[in-house]
């Protein structure tokens, strides 16, 4: 298949891909249950001639050309975040959630790839399995689909995924071989005290005070207990307690994340969080417990497959369209679970910088982040062309 021709076809489809993206963006859903998004994706796939089925909370569809036994999986996530959107986009969300991580872009790009692949079905040297996944953000989606049998009947021998990246020049493809993204573990610390009147704190045990000391003490783990060259981040993004200014509450809750490239380091940090929380709480006459909520392992890109997909991008968009990273980043992604089951390639696609447009370049997960829709055809083309080339080269 000629890459230049395929890219031209994709550019002609731009309006449709953008329309699909905006429809998904306008009605974001969070978590593992995405009924409206699933229905939308299934309807679009049926219109293209696919026979989609629901699996593990997501959607799966296959397309076979020549029956060779070869199969590659293309995956897009489609869940949103509990962020109230503050953009001025005419298709902005108004339901209190937001596609602030670009998963609407991913789903639309895979739908675009589905149309391209269908148009070239007779040229496929095997099967392409399309996977639309829920709850990447909560780290349960990939595991649920794997448990439900997404790697069965037919069994793929490779998998690929794309993720848009705000702050990177539009259309630039970033890739890295080996460990490309950190693993992430979500945790919750529950601090128990004794509620009382705010005027008489001596009659109770203040869980907010205890939790504040725990929060500060946990900063010492990465600063003083790990080697300086060991990448690790402990972030506590949620701290909740109480309902009134004059009442000392019964309980305080901290939720956070641990990010590392090494599962043993994660285990060490989680153990120390438990020890520090327990000791600190007891020092102030309270108690604390720590629980692991969910996790994703470090993402490991297969070197050969990743290089092949990078070369596909260069063939489509030019030699200067790809930047090969020498080391991974501290972001996390539950596509990582696939990377321990079969060879995988996970690439980033630049979605705009502030130098291009003042609206672009804001942080991922920000309430005002805006992604450049002009990159959508590139994403669709790379997914489709990468799959076709992999099937062709496996002969």
What are these regions (language model features)?
Residues 2, 13-20, 33-44, 70, ...:
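General structural feature for long, well-ordered alpha-helical segments within catalytic domains
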Residues 2-100, 104, 108-124:
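Acidic/His- and Gly-rich active-site-bordering loop/insert found
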Residues 24, 61, 74, 103, ...:
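Divalent metal-coordination and catalytic microenvironments
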Residues 59, 81-83, 88-98, 104-105, ...:
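Histidine/acidic-residue-rich, glycine-tolerant segments that coordinate divalent metal ions
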Residues 73-75, 187-189, 346-351:
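Non-cysteine beta-strand/loop elements that form the S-adenosyl-L-methionine
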Residues 114-120, 152, 339-341:
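Alpha-helix C-terminal capping segments
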Residues 212-395:
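Metal-dependent amide/peptide-bond hydrolase catalytic core
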